[in-house]
Amino acid sequence: SRGLGDVYKRQDEDYAAGWRLSCSTKPAGDITVLVPDIASAYQSRMKTADLSSGEEIAIFNQLQQDVQAAGVDFANDFVQAVLTLDEPTLDDTMPDTERLARFAQDAFDGCTEVKLTYHTVKKLAKTLREANFKVQITGTLTDGVLTIMDVSEKEDAPLYGCAIDIGTTTVTGVLMDLKTGTLTAKASAGNGQIRYGADVINRIVEQGKLGGVKRLQDAILKETLLPLVAAMCKSAGIPVSRVFRVCIASNTTMNHLLLGVDANPVRMEPYIPTFFQWRGMTAKDLGFPANPDAEILLAPNIGSYVGGDITAGAFTSLIWDKDEFSLFIDLGTNGELVFGNRDFMMSCACSAGPAFEGGDISCGMRATDGAVESVKIDKDTMEPTLGIVGPEGQKPVGICGSGIIDVIAELYRTSIISSKGQFVREGKRVAHDEHGMGRYILATAAESETGREISITEVDIDSFIRAKAAIFSAINIMLSSLDMDVSVLSHVYVAGGIGSGINMENAVRIGMLPDIDRELFEYLGNTSLSGAYAMARSDCAVDKVDELASNMTYMELSTNPRYMDEFVAACFLPHTSRELFPSSIQE
């Protein structure tokens, strides 16, 4: 095994190669500073998914079946009805609101009271007369109280909901029919806040500046969500006013910044956010593109760095419905974990950085068309075989998270890089710059879509090693705090929108996931989004997610004195303690 001395040796080698810590370096003269253009890499064009293949629909249908089998009813309180009202006369002078309420109450069994929203009242007179007093109403019927949210002259006006996963790096949404659950559109885009920092800490610092709260809120609400929802509604052929419920799953900081709430307490000891759960908000309160009275549901947070994206994801994983111990891992800019079973659950978060989603990687990108999502390298020729997101014949544009896992694992397996992530073999696919920094060429300029070389450098590899080390050290700390180890795990669920799937063997090979039976691993995709979908559709799912959040114990890693030692030890391939990865020794 390797000790911490290797870490200091590595730092000495970096210094000898010309690397310096910018925070402790004073320039003696004019210098040129190169800053990675992280923002432009993630503010790429919005992608609206083609649902005609049925792949996305199949995923969400399977979710519905699984959670229903666990006792969750996919029903909600939304109702619609077509009403033919008596037209007013000089002898029948009942006002429009009372006339509509009377006919609406008769249309539903058990309805004891009718309420109209302000939005409905404003448009009521014109709509009734243009429709000759035959209209469709849309609203909710809860405990006998009918709340009419909209009145339409169209007798078949649709009833839609929207589910959104707001990630630190990427935002993804789906549009659904609230009655049937059918998906009609999906879209994703980079989080507009990325230009203010790649991680939540930098964004919290930015929002603390003059006008910062408004800037950060506008970046996610106006620059990201508004066009995202508009694109989905256009794809589905409906106006945004037909969206009557919105569920958003995001981390604690993203929730605060979306609502324009000061997030600074999240990063200050004792790390207490303004809220964990906030209900009763409507689209008009937030300025969200939907029916003005549409309910905005936020999946509940459970800690300063474990938010609604994880409560929604833990719900989707169904670890709460199992007797055996399971581990749920969400690979994102903030790596979050949940461990437990039906009796208890514990959660924690670690700052993995944006590498899992292609950030801080020279040729990194989100998992959209042109992303290299899988890599295989021939040990003798060192030539790569690439799997690329997109239609047949798609040329590579960059590399996404799953592809980065593969290429680093393959470089290590073929002995092209050492356990420190440095290049130790030469070949036509390995090149070095004027400073001696090595890189592996995945695609030459002629082979790529952009006409630029696609490669992974030693700096990229180092960034990713730190990201995987954050995940593995968090797993170790969480389990050891319970006097357990990885041998107790019966299931390991991996989530995150980093590609169409993860090669679990390679994830173990680089030391990101524990070296246990590979059959125990399952990739679930974007569970934050699928959990938000369930909450948007099902009142029972909302109650269950709230219950999970209230019963989940939060573990603050930043105050654990052992975490940094565990992290440093994991900053090698696969780890300084090779005995933790017996399969890599056999290789």
Regions found by a protein language model. Give the residues of each.
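Glycine-rich phosphate-binding loop of actin/hexokinase-like ATP-binding domains
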Residues: 164-168, 173-201, 265-278, 312, ...
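A contiguous, well-structured pocket-lining segment that forms one wall/lid of small-molecule binding clefts
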Residues: 412-482
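Short, small-residue-biased leader/transition segments that mark boundaries at the very start
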Residues: 3-8
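Nucleotide/phosphate-binding catalytic cleft detector across ATP-hydrolyzing
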Residues: 9-163, 168, 180, 217-218, ...
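N-terminal phosphate-binding loop and adjacent alpha-helix
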Residues: 192-235, 360, 371-376, 463-466, ...
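Phosphate/pyrophosphate-binding loops at sites that engage ATP/ADP/AMP, CoA/4′-phosphopantetheine
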Residues: 225-244, 475-489
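Catalytic phosphate/nucleotide-handling subdomain of diverse soluble enzymes
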Residues: 341-343, 484-548
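Short glycine/threonine-rich loop-to-helix capping motif typified by GTGT followed
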Residues: 251-265, 436, 484-487, 496-515, ...
